[in-house]
């Protein structure tokens, strides 16, 4: 399977109205976080289907052409292909390839869909490499910082919370709303596993918590607790 064939198949599902919706939803205007991105309007289920159909027949030389493509849906398909290959037990090779192409993981949906399944899962089983998360958390690149916190989702699923809290704390002073949301999301996932650990973190770091992070983190709390945290009266 060639990259050209995959791209042609994706383009066959292109939809102008969906393209316009995605351009607004992903904020592609001048100065916005997706200014670099181009959309053709392919729905995620269609992208997943194409990736599933071809991940066994496509090699890295063809994925090379997909993963650097300026079209968002093409890069997304490349990353889903990698995720499928990783889950088919090609783990170390896919992990290293993903690292080599991490600059192409440059929008929040690309991060959120594939990072826990590849980066996070690999690090759970190779803890000596978790230093990468701290490197990314201190990066000037928005997407690397989001990768750092979202990768810890794989650890949360294993009831391991230390990395989430450590990376989350590093990112509390971040200026980007997309980081505030990601940290809050991961804290909410911690809350679903261990209420006390999450609440202790919120109390200890309350003065530094961006409001968006707090709102995301407390979504699952009973109303009385949510109000207390919003008012700082816990």
Summary of predicted features, one role per range:
Residues 1-234:
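Alpha-helical scaffold domains
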């Amino acid at each position: 399977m060639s990259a050209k064939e995959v791209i042609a198949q994706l383009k066959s599902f292109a939809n102008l109205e969906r393209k316009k919706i995605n351009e607004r939803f992903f904020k592609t205007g001048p100065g916005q976080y997706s200014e670099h991105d181009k959309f053709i309007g392919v729905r995620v289920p269609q992208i997943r289907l194409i990736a599933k159909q071809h991940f066994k027949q496509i090699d890295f030389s063809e994925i090379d052409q997909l993963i650097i493509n300026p079209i968002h849906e093409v890069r997304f398909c490349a990353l889903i292909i990698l995720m499928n290959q990783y889950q088919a037990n090609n783990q170390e090779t896919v992990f290293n390839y993903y690292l080599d192409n991490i600059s192409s993981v440059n929008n929040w949906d690309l991060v959120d869909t594939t990072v826990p399944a590849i980066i996070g899962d690999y690090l759970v089983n190779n803890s000596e490499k978790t230093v990468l998360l701290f490197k990314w958390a201190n990066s000037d690149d928005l997407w690397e910082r989001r990768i750092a916190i979202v990768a810890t989702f794989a650890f949360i699923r294993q009831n391991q919370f230390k990395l989430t809290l450590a990376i989350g704390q590093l990112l509390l002073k971040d200026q980007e709303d997309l980081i505030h949301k990601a940290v809050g999301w991961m804290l909410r996932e911690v809350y679903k596993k261990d209420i006390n650990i999450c609440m202790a973190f919120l109390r200890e770091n309350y003065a530094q918590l961006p409001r968006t992070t707090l709102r995301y983190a407390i979504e699952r709390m009973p109303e009385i607790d949510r109000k207390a945290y919003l008012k700082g009266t816990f």
